[in-house]
Amino acid sequence: MELWTEARALKASLRGESTISLKHHQVIVSEDLSRTSSLPEDFSVECFLDFSEGQKEEEEEVVSVSSSQEQEEQEHDCVFSSQPCIFDQLPSLPDEDVEELEWVSRVVDDCSSPEVSLLLTQTHKTKPSFSRIPVKPRTKRSRNSLTGSRVWPLVSTNHQHAATEQLRKKKQETVLVFQRRCSHCGTNNTPQWRTGPVGPKTLCNACGVRFKSGRLCPEYRPADSPTFSNEIHSNLHRKVLELRKSKELGEETGEASTKSDPVKFGSKW
């Protein structure tokens, strides 16, 4: 690409030199004509009207200039032809790439013109200016205050399981510390707790039913009561009555024996 641009620059310089030489030749011819016009009138005018020699000279000069240009072009071509290795080293490009390169070079040449550069500078300089509209600063609020909902921390399932186990253990400890017992028979296993003489939920189901009907006696005990004794307790109402009678009779006989003892001692006196 660089060699191609250098060749174009050399051709442009040669063309400029040829145009300068032609202009110089025209200036010389005009000076000769002005000098001949200043001669006295004694000379014949016909000799000056014969332009055949001048035309021949001009043709010879033009031929010489063209031959010199051809020689210079041949020299430049020889210079480029003497270096074939540079182009051989370059990779061969397809036709499409060559056409694209030519199109790019044309675009670059067109852009390098002063008119395009002026247009580009004008477009770059003229930028639209937008006036800023005054806006109130936004108040910084948390999302929780806007939504009105609290963000609760996520608790893992393991932590929840551990918390439930701790609550169970605490409940079991409280149950073991305070175990409800029946105030009459002392049992702690009953399907339902009933109201007794001490207060609500102080008697077991069996004792509470008998207390409500008015048949709760000290001799009555359920069979599964921890304080049950066959000698002095029973869970049947008939046997409870028999035990009460025997107990009352025993108490009466005891009282009678105590009363008869002081009479015997008094008879001796």
From Swiss-Prot:
Signal peptide: none annotated. A motif (Nuclear localization signal) lies at residues 136-143. InterPro entries: GATA_TF, TF_GATA_pln, Znf_GATA, Znf_NHR/GATA. Keywords: Activator, DNA-binding, Metal-binding, Nucleus, Transcription, Transcription regulation, Zinc, Zinc-finger. One of its GO terms (molecular function) is DNA-binding transcription factor activity. Induction: In leaves, less expressed in dark than in light. Pfam families: GATA. Disulfide bonds: none annotated. SMART domains: ZnF_GATA. It is found in: Nucleus. Residues 245-269 are annotated as: Disordered. GO terms for cellular component: nucleolus; nucleus. It comes from the Eukaryota. Its main location: nucleus. GO terms for biological process: circadian rhythm; positive regulation of DNA-templated transcription. A zinc finger (GATA-type) spans 176-230. Mostly expressed in roots. Also expressed in stems, flowers and leaves. Transcriptional activator that specifically binds 5'-GATA-3' or 5'-GAT-3' motifs within gene promoters. May be involved in the regulation of some light-responsive genes. Belongs to the type IV zinc-finger family. Class A subfamily. PANTHER family: GATA TRANSCRIPTION FACTOR, GATA TRANSCRIPTION FACTOR 3. This is GATA transcription factor 3. It comes from Arabidopsis thaliana. The lineage of its organism: Eukaryota, Viridiplantae, Streptophyta, Embryophyta, Tracheophyta. The gene is GATA3.
